[in-house]
Amino acid sequence: MREIRISKLVLNIAVAESGDRLQKAAKVLEQLTSQVPVYGRARFTVRSFAIRRNEKISCYVTVRGEKAYDLVKRGLAVKEFELIRKNFSDTGNFGFGIQEHIDLGLKYDPSTGIYGMDFYVCLERRGYRVARRRKQKAHVGVKHKVTKEDAIKWFQQEFDGVVLNKAPAS
């Protein structure tokens, strides 16, 4: 009952501009997940970056279930199963980024280019549905919530991962 599992995985590619590059980034996500990505919009105008409010600047996709577990494993293999302590949040989630999408096993296409992406992994225990259901919503108890230490321990057991205290000097 208290085992931790992946609730969802969100893959995000932030291009910071709309147009052709954003469409190609969405195509990369679609090839990777076989799902249609959603576009993220700018919250406010930033003149120095030539971004207008409500302009599409990123694309992301939410993956659940066994497919999410497989994608997390492939992403962590790129990072050599090493994360730093700052990658884990207090609520038991963690995230990391990769520089090139071709490291995940996709073929390089010169017309598409190379995109980096962010992985955000949400962890939960069984019983979290009580907070999301429509009728008789309830709070998840403090002892049942996933903490930062629980998430780190799960990562080390599940993937034989290494958690470093600081980022390695590169």
Curated annotation (Swiss-Prot):
GO MF term set: rRNA binding; structural constituent of ribosome
Compartments (UniProt record): Nucleus; Cytoplasm
Pfam family, one: Ribosomal_L5
This protein's UniProt keywords: Cytoplasm, Nucleus, Ribonucleoprotein, Ribosomal protein, RNA-binding, rRNA-binding
Main location: nucleus
GO BP terms, alphabetized: translation
Domain of life where this protein originates: Eukaryota
Gene Ontology annotations for the cellular component aspect, listed alphabetically: cytoplasm; nucleus; ribonucleoprotein complex; ribosome
Quaternary structure note: Component of the large ribosomal subunit.
Family: Belongs to the universal ribosomal protein uL5 family.
Protein task: Component of the ribosome, a large ribonucleoprotein complex responsible for the synthesis of proteins in the cell. The small ribosomal subunit (SSU) binds messenger RNAs (mRNAs) and translates the encoded message by selecting cognate aminoacyl-transfer RNA (tRNA) molecules. The large subunit (LSU) contains the ribosomal catalytic site termed the peptidyl transferase center (PTC), which catalyzes the formation of peptide bonds, thereby polymerizing the amino acids delivered by tRNAs into a polypeptide chain.
Name listed for the protein in its UniProt record: Large ribosomal subunit protein uL5
Organism listed in the record: Chlamydomonas reinhardtii
